């Protein structure tokens, strides 16, 4: 027990046990659980507190096995609980890491896919340019070796990519010489390369605004590795547009004259050329050293490989050089500048060659700087940031540069296009410019469309504004063939006359969706009932307040038009039927109304044509062809350009123009056919042109013929349909003619060229008959057809 008691002393270091208390009678009472009681939570104390009160206090406290086991179990349970919490947190963090890694992988795949798309678009653009150049100039465009872009898989890239050597200056030199050779083949000179290199460096944020112009290796490494702090990135993005434009130093000497590039070249001293070359050396050397030290930097720069490999140059090869737009002192130059081994004589020779090329550019006018500023201002002051006027005056539109180069070198090589980011800063803002440059850059402005292609489409689009008619409404309530129809002069209202002895009024704005068709069904709002037999003809007054119908019962019914908003289930109104015109003795086949004198013309199978004034007590004013000298009339119409005359067609194949005042026939319109063929030359419909002295007739022999009202001679004849032409209508402007036929088709004709511009299959045949009537709306974009299938259709 002494060993146990002594060994238990080590337990005091783990937890402080409660002190024993002195109970009644001077004995110490242990806390619960000290002797194995159920409530014990820790080992008993080994020392007593207070003065000794009896012989038992001198003995040290003893531990019990149950108490120790209970303590161990308690601590083990607490440890397991903490471990479970830790496992849960660990699993959550692992899931978060996996999610972020998946997102990163997806973004990388998306980036690679976009780069591949860009390369394919570049390839397609070059092919289109070569094809256009060959079509325009008849010669092949020299673009070097035009090859399909190749894409290596990620596994191959990881395996085959060797680590960058420590001394890679030689590799940089060889690559630069090869790239310069490619650019010279495309037509790029060293001066343009210098300008574009400064441009790319500025857009990539590699410029430095320090006074001495030195680039520290640490700052360069931070820029390449994206190691700026979030605060620095925020400040960079929030720069005003003016600061962004000030970095485009190659625009400072821009001039309005046509010799801008020429003056710029002449104004560059030879010393500055050398200085610019030395700047490229320093930037490239520092960049190469950083690439060998940091593999992440090399991987980041590979994202811009598509800029380097573009065959048209685009100046992206200069993206490897870093520096700012300010001139550096010669004392600051690195002695490693000889790495590039630049031939000064070659540069001078190329500059002279470039000057000569710019001589032929004088005829090209550029956008005036003032006009450019006005155009930028017109884009909206509320949407654009404030830009100092000096910066605007120093800037040049990239599109004008592209136009100048295209005008000067169109016959020689591909047009040289400068980066378009300079103009973007006015419209997009500095942060958008930064994002666009670091994203797709100049490739975002690529297009396969040539400006000259728009002119090719002009002849093809000559009739682009011509309306194409499509079926919209189907009128289904008649029980037999619809013989005639007419539109209200102003409202979207239609009246139809049918062989079921009725006329129906339709409001096209009150529609019901059809069950199995894209068109809309319209229910009639009123039904006119007075005829004893089929209704054959129809006419509406010019004000739309009266309607006239002629039927097989030899009567002409005169109707007052109900309101377009009438309730279909209202009680019968007797005042709708205004009267009946009785004079004919056989079926009335044609009606025509003139709003000038409010007169009505009718032609009947009894051989007569009658002129009516419905308002008079004796409505029949005059009768024509009483002796049937010309045959049986089939159709009648007022002359559009001379309402004092009318034209009537006959079943003999001729048409006659009458003077309404004298009742005499003035002109006989005949196509001079033999009498034996007149039976097949039956005229079904005659209409007069609304503005020209021309009469148009529809014949049973599938022809449509045009006659001169003054001479009576036929001026044109054409086979218009596959079956008999039954109906004609001329639009209110006199531009188009619509014809209907028993071949189930409606055809729209251009009256100027006499050509069919649209054909619509509208109705089905019934007893070898199909379309009875067609009509234009006088003031709205509606046309309609009436058919033997008991349907009327409206097209819009």
UniProtKB/Swiss-Prot annotation:
Protein name according to UniProt: Striatin-3
GO terms for biological process, alphabetical: negative regulation of DNA-templated transcription; negative regulation of hippo signaling; negative regulation of intracellular estrogen receptor signaling pathway; response to estradiol
Biased composition regions of type Gly residues, renumbered to the chain: 1-13
Xref: Pfam families: Striatin, WD40
Source superkingdom: Eukaryota
Biased composition (Acidic residues): 253-264
Tissues where this protein is expressed: Mainly expressed in the brain and muscles but is also detected at low levels in various tissues such as kidney, spleen and lung.
Record's function text: Calmodulin-binding scaffolding protein which is the center of the striatin-interacting phosphatase and kinase (STRIPAK) complexes. STRIPAK complexes have critical roles in protein (de)phosphorylation and are regulators of multiple signaling pathways including Hippo, MAPK, nuclear receptor and cytoskeleton remodeling. Different types of STRIPAK complexes are involved in a variety of biological processes such as cell growth, differentiation, apoptosis, metabolism and immune regulation.
Entries under InterPro entries matching the protein: G-protein_beta_WD-40_rep, Striatin_N, WD40/YVTN_repeat-like_dom_sf, WD40_repeat_CS, WD40_repeat_dom_sf, WD40_rpt, WD_repeat_striatin
Family (UniProt): Belongs to the WD repeat striatin family.
Sites bearing Phosphothreonine, chain numbering: 150
Region (Calmodulin-binding): 166-183
Residues recorded as bearing N-acetylmethionine in the entry: 1
Annotated stretches, region: Caveolin-binding: 71-79
WD repeats: 477-516, 530-569, 583-622, 678-717, 720-759, 766-795
SUPFAM superfamilies: WD40 repeat-like
Disordered as annotated region, ranges: 1-60, 252-271, 311-335
Entry's Gene Ontology cellular component terms: dendrite; FAR/SIN/STRIPAK complex; Golgi apparatus; neuronal cell body; nucleoplasm; plasma membrane; postsynapse
Keyword Membrane: yes
